A protein has these predicted regions:
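Residues forming the flavin
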Residues: 1-211
Length: 211
């Protein structure tokens, strides 16, 4: 395995097992092929979370969340508490993709509307987001909504590019752990799965029954 660290630079290590615990990444606006320009004010929910929590920056004043993933629901509440107005959460599916408890605690408790079976059609604005067009997928009625920021919370993808680039597949020698294996609903589940894999590998390599 070739890797890099700050103290030693490029290093090479021999290993009998490789565990890929690279987590997952957010789906982006580009993956949805949403028409429109690329103005300022378009973020993934995770990026908005980093902006607010770490840098103290707000993505906008009037915000629309596209998708009902848990990070998006949590950020809808957080941005409301920070003083922004979350105008709506749009979800193209007939059901919520996040946890029900997050809908109750993050949307219902703060009177943030959730529009199921509604599709984002276009993001408007050249320099800065000025609004969006969306529609009801059943009635096909198009609506314009003025806003200055759009957050995407449309799912997570296991991060496996390292395996793909090396033309490798998971095996007994190459394991996937946590969200790199599949996206878990709770981080505790990913942690427990990773601990189990670590114990299994230790038993295989050390031949021990209790590790």
């Amino acid at each position: 395995v070739t890797f890099i660290n700050r103290s030693d630079g490029v290093c090479v290590a021999r290993a009998q097992r490789l565990v890929l615990a690279t987590g997952c990444r957010e789906r982006t606006r580009e993956m949805l092929t949403v028409p429109g320009f690329r103005p300022a004010g378009i973020f993934t929910a995770g990026l908005a979370q980093e902006m607010v929590n770490i840098y103290g920056l707000m993505p906008g004043k009037k915000i629309v969340v596209v998708g009902s993933g848990d990070i998006g629901l949590i950020m809808a509440r957080r941005l409301t508490l920070e003083g922004s107005q979350v105008l709506a959460v749009l979800e193209i599916q007939p059901q919520l993709s996040g946890l029900i408890r997050n809908k109750v605690q993050c949307l219902d408790d703060f009177n943030i509307p959730l529009y199921l079976e509604h599709e984002l059609l276009e993001i408007l604005g050249k320099n800065r987001v000025e609004g969006i067009r969306y529609r009801d997928v059943k009635g096909q009625k198009e609506v314009y909504m003025k806003c200055d920021a759009v957050l995407f919370s449309v799912g997570l993808i296991p991060e496996r590019d390292l395996l793909i680039d090396q033309e490798m597949t998971p095996s007994n020698e190459v394991r996937l752990a946590g969200n790199a294996n599949y996206v878990h609903e709770l981080v505790d589940h990913a942690t427990k799965e990773s601990e189990k894999i670590g114990q299994e590998i230790a038993q295989e390599l050390l031949g021990a029954k209790n590790v």
